[in-house]
Amino acid sequence: MAECEELVESGGAEEVPRVVAALAGILERVAERNDAAAAAELSAVAAPAASAFRATTKPGISVRAYMARIARFAGCSPACYVVAYVYLDRLLRRGRRLALAVDSYSVHRLLITAVLAAVKFMDDICYNNAYFAKVGGISLVEMNYLEVDFLFGVGFDLNVAPETFADYCAVLQSELLCAEAPPPPLRLQHCCLSDDDAGAGCSAQQQLAA
């Protein structure tokens, strides 16, 4: 649990929490990988287009910058980002039949919606949907629709057991350690989410999207 405490510590006024940097690193890498996969298999591009989370054009802001913006303005506890990570995993595992994937077209909307859901479940005080829509750069109508779609997507399964929270913290901590250490030639990438909440760890991770 010590690594969880270290991971979710609040940084200074100008410092992005470590958990934000870790989650941004994972999702940015997954989006890039899925972009490459979609480019290699053009026949698979049409399937995800129907998702409410998939924008018609790529946002002009990077995943890391977008996460930093959310962290700066959302005013939520760092633990919310771990919970948002859990929610994203649940959504994507359930959404495989709908070909929902994390790529450059969907990652931003998935992030802002996952954080919104986590904040409402975790924090006693939080901003409303109109505020989060402004932070995320989308309309209030879109924010409301994405929230409902997200909740149905996870089956309203919002509770996160302490053991599950710790497991996802461990994955995020591993991401930080890999980012800080000189990478070996063939290092394993921690860019996957676990297949099972209870027992999620680096060795039990599963791809965010096929």
List the predicted regions and their residue ranges.
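Acidic, Ser/Thr/Pro-rich regulatory low-complexity segments at or just upstream of the first helical elements
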Residues: 1-79, 90-99, 163-210
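Secondary-structure capping and boundary motifs in well-ordered enzyme cores
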Residues: 59, 103-110, 142
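Contiguous, well-ordered alpha-helical segments that form the cores/surfaces of helical PPI scaffolds
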Residues: 82-90, 108-120
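Short conserved catalytic/interaction loops centered on acidic-Pro-aromatic/His motifs
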Residues: 100-103, 121-136
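Channel- or pocket-lining gating/hinge segments that regulate access to a cavity or pore
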Residues: 130-173, 179
